[in-house]
């Protein structure tokens, strides 16, 4: 029975890529810099303190993968752990350092075109675009129209939004159009309808995602995003390994978290909603136990990125990694003879880096299975090596990009 479990630690980069200079990210290192801050006692909170401890991930090969990527061991990680997994680091072929590009490339389809971006920090959106969105939605105005941190924009504009009913439109360095609205005063269904309108109107702008950002709360300092985020992505430009598994092998792909949104539902046969790392982990375990032959269980742990990376919360990121490390053996314990587990990421988001954006980094490629030889996979030239490996494993037609590493 062939089953693969892909766990994406969203934003968990392990060292700057060779082309990081093109992105202003030379020297970025999500894992390494978190470990440095922990070692220096600068990443303590009510959930953790001291050096970064990831004993189980180190056994799987994380510390060695980071060493091969950067030339140094991350402090606190066990450099002498007995390795039970195959480990490597992968560079990105895709032109961007965004979520869809990373995930599509993982599934064998790198993004070799340039996304559209809204580059102006203020007055970011063309008037003709916002006019069409407002007209179709029956709205008389909007707030924002700028680059913004998703949490700061709520403090800045949330109360005015509640008073006026005007949605908050904002963007970032990514190819995104984000809409924040209060779940109770504006309405979740109404927000999702507005996002669908925006998705349609953005077709000519080549924008990767429209993101619904619902929130709740009574006023400034009390606003919180809810778990009802939706990402409306364009479809991948060619068939991913997910689609090939479903179409060629009549297999199943179980999406946990925002995976289905990222792939615009292409190649997804089941969607499981869960919010927060503990709930995502529980859902993953449940779906692994239920999975049949020719199945991929695919989970995105978005909080590493959204709650800690973008918010530059080093202690929060470290605590989340240690929580994940403390539970990963639960997956190993229920794996069957031919199963394959892949731990990876889609980009970096170094919480010590200036700004709030992603960082261009290598991603870890950590593979475990009872039939998978332990040892180094070395440097992989593309995230698409993961997709090609899955294509080989499941016996689908080969992908156009990537090399099998098993």
UniProtKB/Swiss-Prot annotation:
Biological pathway: Carbohydrate degradation; 2-deoxy-D-ribose 1-phosphate degradation; D-glyceraldehyde 3-phosphate and acetaldehyde from 2-deoxy-alpha-D-ribose 1-phosphate: step 1/2
SUPFAM superfamilies registered for this protein in UniProt: Alkaline phosphatase-like, DeoB insert domain-like
Keyword Ion transport tagged: no
Signal peptide segment: none
Cofactor note: Binds 2 manganese ions.
List of residues binding Mn(2+) 1: 10, 346-347
Keyword presence, Metal-binding: yes
Domain of life according to the entry: Bacteria
Subcellular location, record wording: Cytoplasm
Reactions the enzyme catalyzes: 2-deoxy-alpha-D-ribose 1-phosphate = 2-deoxy-D-ribose 5-phosphate; alpha-D-ribose 1-phosphate = D-ribose 5-phosphate
Pfam families: Metalloenzyme
Enzyme Commission code(s) on record: 5.4.2.7
Residues involved in Mn(2+) 2 binding: 305, 310, 358
GO-annotated cellular components: cytosol
Entry keyword set: Cytoplasm, Isomerase, Manganese, Metal-binding
One GO-annotated biological process of the protein: nucleotide metabolic process
Co-factor(s): Mn(2+)
Functional note: Isomerase that catalyzes the conversion of deoxy-ribose 1-phosphate (dRib-1-P) and ribose 1-phosphate (Rib-1-P) to deoxy-ribose 5-phosphate (dRib-5-P) and ribose 5-phosphate (Rib-5-P), respectively.
Similarity-based family: Belongs to the phosphopentomutase family.
Identification of the protein by name: Phosphopentomutase
Organism for this UniProt entry: Vibrio campbellii (strain ATCC BAA-1116)
Lineage: Bacteria, Pseudomonadati, Pseudomonadota, Gammaproteobacteria, Vibrionales
């Amino acid at each position: 029975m062939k089953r693969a479990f892909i766990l994406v630690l969203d934003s968990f980069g392990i060292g700057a890529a060779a082309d990081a200079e093109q992105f202003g990210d030379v020297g970025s290192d999500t894992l390494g810099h978190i470990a440095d801050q922990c070692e220096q006692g600068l990443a303590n909170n009510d959930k953790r303190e001291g050096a970064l401890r990831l004993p189980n991930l180190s056994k799987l090969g994380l510390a060695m993968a980071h060493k091969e990527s950067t030339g140094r061991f991350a402090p606190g990680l066990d450099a002498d752990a007995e390795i039970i997994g195959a480990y490597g680091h992968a560079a990105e072929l895709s032109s961007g350092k965004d979520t869809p590009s990373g995930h599509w490339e993982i599934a064998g389809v790198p993004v070799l075109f340039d996304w559209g971006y809204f580059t102006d920090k203020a007055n970011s959106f063309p008037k003709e675009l916002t006019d069409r969105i407002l007209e179709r939605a029956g709205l008389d105005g909007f707030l924002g129209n700028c680059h913004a941190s998703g949490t700061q924009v709520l403090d800045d504009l949330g109360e005015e939004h509640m008073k006026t009913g005007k949605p908050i439109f904002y963007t970032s360095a990514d190819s995104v159009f984000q809409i924040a609205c209060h779940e109770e005063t504006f309405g979740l269904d109404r927000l999702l309808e507005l996002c669908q309108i925006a998705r349609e109107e953005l077709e000519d702008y080549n924008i990767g995602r429209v993101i619904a950002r619902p929130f709740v709360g009574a006023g400034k300092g009390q606003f919180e995003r809810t778990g009802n985020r939706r990402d409306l992505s364009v479809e991948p430009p060619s068939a991913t390994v997910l689609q090939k598994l479903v179409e060629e092998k009549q297999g199943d792909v179980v999406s946990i978290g925002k995976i289905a949104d990222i792939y615009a539902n292409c190649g997804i046969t089941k969607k499981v909603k869960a919010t927060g790392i503990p709930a995502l982990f529980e859902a993953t375990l449940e779906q692994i136990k239920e999975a049949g032959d020719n199945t991929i269980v695919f989970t995105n742990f978005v909080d590493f990125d959204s709650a800690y990376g973008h918010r530059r919360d080093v202690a929060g990121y470290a605590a989340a990694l240690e929580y994940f490390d403390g539970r990963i053996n639960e997956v190993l314990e229920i794996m069957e003879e031919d199963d394959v587990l892949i731990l990876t990421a889609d980009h970096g988001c170094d919480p010590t880096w200036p700004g709030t954006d992603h960082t261009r980094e290598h991603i870890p490629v950590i593979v475990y299975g009872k039939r998978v030889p332990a040892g180094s996979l070395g440097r992989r030239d593309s995230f698409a090596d993961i997709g090609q490996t899955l294509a080989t494993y499941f016996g689908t037609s080969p992908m156009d990009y990537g090399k099998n590493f098993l």
